Amino acid sequence: MTGLDDLVGEEYGPVPIEPTPDRVAEFVVATGDDPDRWASVVPPSFANASLFAVAPRFLEDPRVVPFTRSLIHSEQRFEWTRPALVGATIDVVGRVGAARQRAGLNLVSFEVSASSDGVPWLSGSAQFLLSTEAAAAAAEEKEPPASERPPHDPPGGSLPLPGVGEALEPMRVGASRLDLVRYAAASGDWNPIHRDHWSAVAAGLPGTIVHGLLMTAWMGQLAARYSTANLPLQSLTVRFRKALRPAVPAAVTGTVAERAETGTDLDLVLDAGSERLITGTARVTP
């Protein structure tokens, strides 16, 4: 079986999304964000819903399905060019930007672009690792009670930006299994490994896991507290290192890497105890 090279340049979409007030409010609640801040402007993390408007079309493509016995979302990048208004139609296009094989894995760069009322709003890329072989089994763990949630801090109001090298205010995060179902409904990411124990075990996981892009949303929320702009984030890039189980407490922390007139760069991490789960960088609008 050959790789996925022949799909480079293939497009999926455009797919329209209607960010109605109710849908945006549902998404804000599902990600634990600030409803007052996002009453008229779509939150940056709504990029997650844009990606999953088109990514399933790629992953369910009959030419791709044989390669999805093992699927890892290893990296994600988003860049925003302007605010998107609640109620303004968002059109999303996905594209296979690159594909190569290495050590039995297919490395695919899946690009996404979105416009709001015809004007560019978002661009980004997801790095997927796909294989025709099933993932190695992990030690199975018992699922926590569906409603068990660790401490989770609301984003709160804006904060003064620290100096270069100084720490951001930590934010405790985590999700219950019910939270994961709510997020799946709000984002369109219905991958069963986030809600069905046996699907997760079959994928080589100990049990259900928190959506990677939900954790990315939490990281973006911390960064966005350091900007009062309607477009608080100019970019966010993350690398997924380990999974987070529901009901496990975690925290987003960060430091100021560089300050400039055009934007402030932040280094971000999401840890669960001593385990580093995600590393990332964000550029915040002054």
Predicted feature residues:
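Hot-dog-fold acyl-thioester-processing enzymes
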Residues: 1-75, 135-232
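HotDog/MaoC-like acyl-thioester-processing domains
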Residues: 1-7, 75, 80-169, 243-286
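Intrinsically disordered, low-complexity sequence elements enriched in Ser/Thr/Gly/Pro
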Residues: 175, 193, 237-239, 274
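A conserved acidic, glycine/proline-rich C-terminal tail/linker
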Residues: 226, 230-242, 251
